From Swiss-Prot:
NCBIfam families: lexA
EC class of the enzyme, as a word: hydrolase
UniProt-recorded name of the protein: LexA repressor
UniProt DNA-binding residue ranges: 27-47
Keywords: Autocatalytic cleavage, DNA damage, DNA repair, DNA replication, DNA-binding, Hydrolase, Repressor, SOS response, Transcription, Transcription regulation
Cross-referenced InterPro entries: LexA (IPR006200), LexA-like (IPR039418), LexA/Signal_pep-like_sf (IPR036286), LexA_DNA-bd_dom (IPR006199), LexA_repressor (IPR050077), Peptidase_S24_LexA (IPR006197), Peptidase_S24_S26A/B/C (IPR015927), WH-like_DNA-bd_sf (IPR036388)
Protein source organism: Xylella fastidiosa (strain Temecula1 / ATCC 700964)
Family, per entry: Belongs to the peptidase S24 family.
UniProt KW DNA repair keyword: yes
Enzyme Commission identifier(s): 3.4.21.88
Active site, per annotation: S131, K168
Catalytic activity: Hydrolysis of Ala-|-Gly bond in repressor LexA
Length: 211
């Protein structure tokens, strides 16, 4: 089956967008470009393009259209050119439970869409424990951390107590600082005056790897 003129034009739009920006257009952007009333028509044409071996789609990923003729190396190179793609190192573990010893050493680097985070993170940490369960942060998740020492009461932070790292809800009152879990099975951590305490960064979103 040959491609229609519209399907060839959609393929050209996808190719040009990937070459220029490193990412494919969204289905909404394709619909707008061709005057479709919604994305259903776009999905039909994308189905045909995929059946013809021109593209492949990554389920559940925004802008997840890929050109079949690109190699994995080509895709990574294009992604690194995009302003919407973050290249983030995984810098060890962070406790969502009792603080654990710092485990800071670059494990690997992942490429992620900026849309998953606000503000943009500087690095990722892998969560160990479930003390932040009620905030939707689970054991094994990768959390984005925006590196800063400025934080306000009520924000979720990555904090250092002496040589240990933890992720908790920050509560600051007139005479004390507490790090609160979001799971009733865990007790708050009271920061003592004789401890070396610092905010390492703000929690700004997460990635849940396939279990």
């Amino acid at each position: 089956m040959s491609l229609s003129d519209i399907q060839q034009a959609i393929l050209s739009l996808i190719t040009n967008n990937i070459n220029a920006d490193g990412v494919s257009p969204s289905q909404t952007e394709i619909a707008r470009a061709f005057g479709f009333k919604g994305v259903r028509a776009v999905q039909h044409h994308l189905d045909v393009l995929e059946q013809q071996g021109m593209i492949r789609r990554i389920p559940g990923q925004a802008r997840g259209i890929r050109l079949k003729h690109l190699t994995e190396v080509d895709e990574v190179a294009l992604a690194l050119q995009s302003k919407d793609v973050l290249r983030l190192p995984v810098l060890g573990r962070v406790a969502a439970g009792q603080p654990i010893g710092a485990d800071i050493g670059e494990d690997h680097v992942v490429l992620l869409d900026r849309v998953f985070f606000s503000p943009a993170p500087d690095y990722l940490l892998r969560v160990q424990g479930d003390s932040m369960r009620d905030e939707g942060i689970f054991d094994g998740d990768l959390i984005g951390v925006h590196r800063t020492q400025d934080a306000h009461s009520g924000q979720i932070v990555v904090a250092r107590i002496d040589d240990e790292i933890t992720v908790k809800l920050l509560k600051i009152s007139k005479d004390r600082i507490r790090l609160l879990p979001r799971n009733p099975d865990f007790a708050p951590i009271e920061v003592r005056s004789d401890q070396d305490f610092a905010i390492e960064g703000l929690y700004c979103g997460l990635l849940r790897p396939n279990r």
